[in-house]
C-alpha cells in the first residue's frame, strides 16, 4: 500500500511538473498582497505591499522593463515603516535609473554595542519583563532617499553613480513595560563612547561612484551567471560638519547551475570598509546597497545579511560577510492561470569585522564606575551560522520566503525565524 501511495504521489508531481510551463507575461502585472511576515528581532509584521512589473511585449520575460514597489507595515515589537521603489531599465535610453524613499521607526531598536564580541552580552538584561530591564534597546528613526544611475561601458560592464540622503534620529525608548533609566545607549554616552554632538543622530549626504557587472540569466531568480558591484562612498556630515568619511563597498554573487532550472549553488561575498575620515556612530549599522529593494538595510545580522545572528549584533567600521546556499526547486505547478515554484534552500553564512570602531576608547572606558562591563578581551574571528529556508515563487518575480537560522556563537546569535518577500541575494 505504501509503495502504491508513493508511486501515486511521484506520478502526480511528475505530471504537475511536466505540465507546468510558465507562460510569458506582457504589459503591466501587479500583485497586491498582505504583509503578514515575521522576524525574530522585530516580531510579527502586519501591513501590505504591492509590486508592479512592466514586461513590454514579453520578449525578455521574466526580466522586467519597469518595477515599482510600495509597502508599509507595523510590527508587534514596536516598529513601523513605509517604503517605495522605482527601478527602470528603459525610462532613459541605454541606462538604468533607480530611486527609493524609506521611512523606518524602530521604537525597540537593538543596540548591543561596538565591535562584536568585544561588547559583552548579558541575556538577563535584554527585555527582561520580571526586572523591567531593556538594557540593549533604544529608539531609532531613519529617513533615507536614494537615486542611482547605471550606464553600459562595454558588454555587461557598467559604470554607476548615485546619491543618498539619510537622516537618523536616536533617543531613549519609551515602553510602558520597561524602564529606560539604565541602557547601553546611556552608558555609552556617560563615558563618551558616544559623543554628545552625535548622540541624537544627524543627517548625511552620500555620493557614490563605481562599476557593476551583470551576466545573470534572470535577475530576481538566477539559474546561472554572476553579478558584482564595486564602488566608493564619500559621506559628508551635514549636521555636525565633522564626521566626513569614505568607505569601499564590494558585493559579488555567483550562481552555479548543478541541474539547470532545478538545482543551483549560489553564493554571495560582501565587503564594506571605512578607509578614510571618521564615521559617526549612528551610521555604523547602515549596509550600503545600490538598489534598496526593501526597507531594512541596517545591521549585520538577521534576515538580510547574516541569518542566525541578532539584528545589529555586529557594529563596526568595517565588515566582511558571505552567504552560501543550495536552491532546490522541488515542485512546479500551474494554478488559477498562474505559475508556481516551490524551492528549498539550506544555507551557511559567515561574517567578520574588518575594522573596529574607536577601539582605543572602547578599551579605555571598558568598566563603568558601578562595575558594569562595556568591553571584554576577545579574539577576532569568523562567525558562522546555518539553517534552512523555503520559497514559493508566483510567476518567477513574486516570492514568499521563510528561513530559520542559528549562529554558532551564543554571545552573538540566537535562533532566528524570518519571513520576507525576496531572496537574500
Predicted regions and their residues:
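Outer-membrane beta-barrel transmembrane domain signature
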Residues: 174-190, 195-198, 203-205, 262, ...
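Gram-negative/organellar outer-membrane beta-barrel architecture
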Residues: 23-30, 38-203, 304, 411-425
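C-terminal outer-membrane beta-barrel translocator/porin domains of Gram-negative envelope proteins
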Residues: 218-336
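Structural signature of outer-membrane beta-barrel channels/translocons
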Residues: 37, 53-55, 87-91, 150-154, ...
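Short loop/turn motifs that connect adjacent beta-strands in outer-membrane beta-barrel proteins
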Residues: 21-29, 56-65, 91-97, 154-156, ...
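Extracellular loop and loop/strand-boundary signature of outer-membrane beta-barrel proteins
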Residues: 69-71, 130-135, 192-197, 234-240, ...
